[in-house]
Regions:
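A short glycine-rich, Lys/Arg-flanked "PGG" loop and its adjoining helix->strand segment in the class I
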Residues: 61-75
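Local beta-strand N-terminus motif with an aromatic residue
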Residues: 45-46, 72
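Conserved class I S-adenosyl-L-methionine
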Residues: 74-109, 128-135
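GHKL-family ATP-binding catalytic core of two-component histidine kinases
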Residues: 39-41, 58
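A conserved beta-strand element that flanks and buttresses the S-adenosyl-L-methionine
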Residues: 49
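Short catalytic micro-motifs in class I SAM-dependent methyltransferases
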Residues: 52-56, 79
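Conserved Class I S-adenosyl-L-methionine
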Residues: 119-208
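Class I SAM-dependent methyltransferase SAM/SAH-binding core
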Residues: 1-38, 62
């Protein structure tokens, strides 16, 4: 919803009727369907966009193939590169998070098996990002102490116990350790945390 352009015809796809019900008034029409069974004709759209969602699909190859099938021009996917380095949150406090994400996010090679050659474009995250994914609060460390913030980040839900990491972060913020280690980040307007735009500009020929 947050990334839907308003200057062209858009059709959104959501697997959940509940998610469709949460779309704001005036949003583009939405169709309830899984990624692996898009109810559209081949080449129905000029472009397809998937934002931080592919790693949730139980059949990623099937979903990517469907994106390719319904798209005439390009497929664009926002994802996270499993070979990217962690950042202070995962390096100092929650190393399990990056291990979990590396196991579930698709690699470039995996996507190219279905989409053909792709281009990876770095997407630096601005310091005031409001979208609430894992790296959004890299310059606002206190936010990660908020259970509501963590509740919107799916990887936290996969951890067995977040309390030890939270306690270390809380202590380091209180005694100034975080500021001594990472205070330089407060001067940065944006940071490359491994998020990538995957662009497949020329779909492979459709299967007969």
């Amino acid at each position: 919803g947050s990334y839907e352009p308003t200057d062209r015809r858009v059709v959104a796809v959501e697997p959940s009727r509940e998610m469709i019900g949460q779309r704001p008034a005036g949003a583009a029409p939405a169709v309830q369907a899984p990624a692996t069974a898009l109810p559209f004709a081949a080449g129905a759209f000029a472009a397809a966009l998937a934002v931080l969602t592919v790693h949730h699909w139980p059949d990623r190859a099937g979903g990517l193939a469907e994106l390719r099938r319904v798209t005439r021009d390009r497929v664009v996917i926002l994802t996270w590169a499993p070979d990217a380095a962690g950042f202070w949150l995962t390096e100092d406090y929650f190393p399990e998070l990056v291990a979990i994400d590396r196991a579930i996010f698709p690699t470039r090679e995996e996507m190219e098996r279905t989409l053909g050659p792709v281009e990876l474009r770095p997407l630096p995250i601005p310091h005031d990002c409001v979208d609430g994914f894992l790296g959004a609060y890299w310059r606002r460390p206190h936010a990660y102490l908020d259970a509501v913030v963590r509740g919107a980040i799916s990887t936290f839900g996969k951890m067995a116990d977040v309390e030890p990491g939270l306690e270390r972060l809380r202590r380091d913020l209180d005694d100034g350790t975080w500021m001594r280690r990472h205070g330089g980040l407060l001067e940065r307007a944006e940071l490359d945390l491994g998020y990538r735009l995957v662009v497949a500009p020329t779909p492979l020929p459709l299967a007969a």
